[in-house]
Amino acid sequence: MQRFIIAICVVLLVINCSPKKEIKKVRIGMCSDVHLPTMHDAEYRISSFIDSMKIAKPDFIVELGDFGIPDERYAPYFEIWNSFPGPKYHIIGNHEMDGGTSLEEAIAYRKMMNSYYSFSRNGFLFIVLDGNDKEYPDQKGYRSYIGAEQISWLKEELKKASEPIILFSHQGIGSDPGNPGERYSIKNADKVRALFEIHNQSKPESRIIASFNGHTHHDFAENINGIWYITINSMAYKWLGEEYEYLRYNEGVDKDFKWIKYTAPYKEPLFTVVEISTEGYITMSGKYSSYVGPTPWELGYPEHLKKFVKPQITKRFMEF
């Protein structure tokens, strides 16, 4: 009996002395689709985000694209962004190349080494993708594709990864139902997601947890085969289009900012703080606003888009 008790004590001692798996957490200040050239109150919006982040003190901040073009008119707003004292990251959106701006100019202005890159923080690997590749060599106009060269780079990043992975891109990589206006994922999203899923099966210790994007000015999250695909709403507005023209502010604003009348602006800027933990959860702080002027639905905007189009970033708790 005495030997049995001793054996039990030894087992318990071994269990208690076994190294506990370290819990890793990271907090991210996140915004998307600021669209500096579109909004007359862009300074207020970007300042609100940075001021809030100086108080929240996340591990880093990131904007998910469509921030603005390299132009002296917008230089003060880039300075506000750069006033955040911690690490900060840009993602290249499709509107970064407006006004004849080249990809190289957009990258250089932000002091980025490349439009796709990776970095580590708090035991997580963050991979930034560029959805603006050409689908074919002579493609003109709008792009939404991840090309072969970038795919090869991504495969190498996944191959050498040893930490849990979070993805950032401007255009989404989630599902695309095909209903008008619902989703605008990259054209080869299915292929890229398949690559993610193969990686998660072969290297669960460095699994891809989530992919964050902007672009659609939607508020949406979905889980596809164990990976969260999360669309962060625009800081500023929902684009409606010329058929929904409405004078949102006044004639003076409309004269100097001609695109606002085709949008449904949010009264208050939208942004969020995301926390990710290896305990198996993602949290997002919520931020709720309202429209300046009539809602999209009062102007006849398609009803089937209500589940995406909201003047808010929804508070979320997502498990993985």
Regions found by a protein language model. Give the residues of each.
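Active-site-proximal beta-strand elements of phosphoester/diester hydrolases
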Residues: K25-T38, G123-D133, I166-F168, I227-N233, ...
